Amino acid sequence: MSEWTWDESLYAGSAAHYPVGRMAYPEALGVGLRDELGLDGQGRLLDVGCGPGSLTLLLAPYFATVVGVDADADMLAVAAGRASDAGIGNAEWHQSRAEELPGELGAFQIVTFAQSFHWMDQPLVAARIRGMLAPGGRWVQVRATTHRGLDGPDELPRPRPPWDAIDALVARYLGPVRRAGQGVRLNGALPDEEEIMKAAGYEGPDRLIVGGDEIEDRTVEQLIASVFSLSSSAPHLFGTRLPDFEAELRELLTSTADHGRFAERRREIETVIWH
């Protein structure tokens, strides 16, 4: 099978579901990065593959200007709306693929990638971002899983979401191979990101671990949004069968919830910092 290539339908229809279905980054992540990086409310942040601004807006108080870049126009519209609702006035949004940078955006003290670098041409993007970092600037990659929590036998205040059954339902509609845009994305060996970064001239990395084990209360609606926030089960993939899938998903969740609610134990968040 040919190698997967990006196309603009990757997250088609997912933007509105993302901030509802994904667990928000905790305030501790922003505080931890503030302390680790010495952020003081000055300078510029570039958030690459920003989606609906989940990390961009969390870090906005620690910079004079934050710039979110994403290839998906709908994601940027949601991000701009969230910034407006939160009264955040120092955020800018630009539609662009990471591979198209720098795009006359200028230099940045910090460049972040939150759950996004794996979608990109990593050697190309690493090299281009290197030229966008101001002297002393740093690259920060946030590794997290926010659509679902940890599996485990430990008891929680409410039942865990039936993720195995959810995955099986998605596979029944879309097939067993993970969908991604107009193609499929096969599981395989991941690129050695440390080798890529060092080849591009970066030094490091330093690591910061934040959170983990917190209990998150989640509703049926949040779980439905979580499924639709994923590229592998984005709404457009279901075509005319979308209403049928959503009805089955809702029935599955309603029948296993405790009065419409679930509990999940959050995963830790790792940040990898290069300079």
Regions found by a protein language model. Name each.
Residues M1-D40:
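Conserved class I S-adenosyl-L-methionine
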Residues R34, L57-A60, R130:
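A structural alpha-helix within SAM-dependent methyltransferase catalytic domains
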Residues R44-L46, P52-E100:
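Class I SAM-dependent methyltransferase SAM/SAH-binding core
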Residues P102-I110:
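A short acidic, Gly/Pro-enriched loop at the edge of an enzyme's catalytic core
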Residues F113-F117, V142-A144:
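Residues lining the SAM
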Residues M120-I129:
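A short, conserved alpha-helix within the catalytic core of class I
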Residues R130-E214:
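Conserved catalytic/acceptor-binding region of the Class I
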Residues L186-H275:
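Conserved Class I S-adenosyl-L-methionine
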